[in-house]
């Protein structure tokens, strides 16, 4: 079920002093070949963990690119931590992005720098002192299980280890918002579990985490909030949701049909059995 503008206003009224970390209000993005996002409205509160799900082309990546100001909306309002992104000039976009953590499917590591230096770079570009770098980098490497790899270069690491470096770099500044676009897309199931556990630990520190993913098993396992998109529209916004909205499966329905029908104890109306079969 999509979030309506009335839902947004109700949430704001319930928490008047805590603006949402992310707010989309009637946001649309039109491309030359169609709508990437169509009249989308939702909010994400401080400390939430949210999955964006949907098929390829559903609008997940458009949401992520809008959030980092890689794209501008055709219409509507986007706010991050209460700040209207339309007010951020192109010159100030790099400064805005430094307050976000972003994890990509393809890692985007600096190939000629070690694990330590890849993570330290995220601090250096924000003006952190050498003392801060020396204090923060070892801590984040311990959190991400990379303490023994700090002198390795990216080509000496497995895919899962490279993604851990990407997560460490995104989180070393302790951003209020971390965005992960298909973070397990190139990883095997066991490694994917490790990455999602890491993102969950980060979320437990208070950072809001939004993950765009096709990993249905992971979404079903974690049971966090799910926002589902289809053809640019939000079609479901569910707390503790599954990857796909769960109806009775074909197998379950087949089992139901194989059960012997009980003797009726009252006059049945047409369709009663089907009503009960699909009732929660």
Language-model segments: residues:
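Helix-to-loop junction immediately C-terminal to a conserved catalytic motif
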Residues: 68
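Conserved ABC transporter NBD signature motif
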Residues: 76-84
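ABC ATPase NBD coupling module
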Residues: 85-101, 130, 202-204, 246-249
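Short coil-to-helix segment of the ABC ATPase nucleotide-binding domain corresponding to the Q-loop/switch region
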Residues: 113-120
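A short, proline-enriched helix->beta-strand linker immediately N-terminal to the Walker B motif
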Residues: 172-176
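Catalytic Walker B motif of ABC-type/P-loop ATPase nucleotide-binding domains
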Residues: 178-181
């Amino acid at each position: 079920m999509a979030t309506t503008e009335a839902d947004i206003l109700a949430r704001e009224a319930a928490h008047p002093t805590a603006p949402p970390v992310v707010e989309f209000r009637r946001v649309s993005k039109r491309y030359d070949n169609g709508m990437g996002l169509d009249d989308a409205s939702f909010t994400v509160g401080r400390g939430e963990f949210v999955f964006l799900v949907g098929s390829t082309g559903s609008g997940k990546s458009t949401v992520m690119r809008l959030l980092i100001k890689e794209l501008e909306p055709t219409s509507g309002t986007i706010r991050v931590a209460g700040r209207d992104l339309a007010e951020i000039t192109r010159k100030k976009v790099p400064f805005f992005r430094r307050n976000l953590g972003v994890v990509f499917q393809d890692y985007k590591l600096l190939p000629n720098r070690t694990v330590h230096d890849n993570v330290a770079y995220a601090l250096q570009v924000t003006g952190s002192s050498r003392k801060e770098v020396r204090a923060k980098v070892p801590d984040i490497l311990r959190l991400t299980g990379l303490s023994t790899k700090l002198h390795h270069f990216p080509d000496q690491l497995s895919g899962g280890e490279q993604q851990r470096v990407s997560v460490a770099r995104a989180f070393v500044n302790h951003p209020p918002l971390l965005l992960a676009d298909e973070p397990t897309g190139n990883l095997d199931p066991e490694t994917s579990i490790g990455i999602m556990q890491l993102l969950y630990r980060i979320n437990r520190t208070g950072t809001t985490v939004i993950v765009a993913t096709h990993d249905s098993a992971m979404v079903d396992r974690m049971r966090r909030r799910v926002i589902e998109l289809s053809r640019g529209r939000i079609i479901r916004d569910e707390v503790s949701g599954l990857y796909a909205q769960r109806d009775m499966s074909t197998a379950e329905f087949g089992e139901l049909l194989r059960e012997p029908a009980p003797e009726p104890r009252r006059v049945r109306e047409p369709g009663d059995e089907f009503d009960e079969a699909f009732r929660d």
